[in-house]
Amino acid sequence: MDSSTLIKRLETAKSSFQNLELQLADPDVASDPKQLETIARERSRLEPLVNDYLKLQIIEKECLEAKGLVKESRDDKEMELLAREELQNLELSKNELIQKLTLALLPKDPRDERSVMLEIRAGAGGNEACLWAGDLARMYERYGQKLGWNVKPISSTEADMGGFREMIISVKGESVYSQLKFEAGVHRVQRVPSTESQGRVHTSTATVAVMPEADPVEVKIESTDLEISTARSGGAGGQNVNKVETAIDLFHKPSGIRVFCTQERSQMQNRERAMEILRAKLLELELAEANAKERSARLSQVGTGDRSEKIRTYNYKDNRTTDHRLGVNFPLEQVLSGQLEDVIGACIAEEQKRQMEELSNQSED
């Protein structure tokens, strides 16, 4: 982004911020709690950006003063040296602030602040794939716990030999989607299964879908499009297990999506949870369609977000995790223990780099 485009966008943000301040002082706005909350939230979002812009203006003024001092001190070498050192420090602070402001102005995904549902499905590899799906679930659980997120399995189908055929995990917290969206795709593992007597390395896969939670208003579901039946639950039902039909089997006819929910203790809770999962799945379908259209206009990006894209290989023999989108290796044990900060951070940095290149190309056009 060139400097003129940056300043123009910062001035627009500053004007918007000042306008919001005026609205907050309006008695009519103060008497409308909903409008007041919306305006206050937008003001809070813009405040750090505007404050940094004001800092930039101050530093630019100080840079001009320092340059003037350098010229005035040419006859005093010691003073000139001090002035040049001060100018160098100011220029460094200025460039760091410009970089920060540029990143802050990059397009934001409106869903980044949302909680998500992770759907992990065993792929190729039979029993070993089911075990691998369980390993991935534990990896995300550890990562979420480190960040203080609330991670809870809400639907699962266990495999006969251990692990899971599929599992849906609710991950609630601040800006969850902004990080976990880079985990969508096929995760491939290369290792020797515990049942392998010859010591041969097997390759198995599991698929991860990352679904931002959908608001009921955002995804409209007609009751006539649903087929709902109940079943006896084998979940956390205590004495009610196999006596009361608490499980919900929900089928959405237009999309063909089926959700079977057994984790909650009551039929009503399972129904609410099943509807929550269905809304997230339907929103994912909409996003996939929108992303496909957007990708056709892009030259590159950090992954497609598609659940069929192979994004990572976990090689046990070499103790290596390879992210194929980045072409970078990470320590296997570190990643599986839930230390995903470096991997996800690298994906975010690469995405920001791509966005900055797009903005630069747009400004040149």
Swiss-Prot record:
NCBIfam families, per database record: prfA, PRK00591.1
Thylakoid listed as a keyword: no
The UniProt record lists the keyword DNA repair: no
Highest taxon of source: Bacteria
Name recorded for this polypeptide: Peptide chain release factor 1
Stated role: Peptide chain release factor 1 directs the termination of translation in response to the peptide chain termination codons UAG and UAA.
Family: Belongs to the prokaryotic/mitochondrial release factor family.
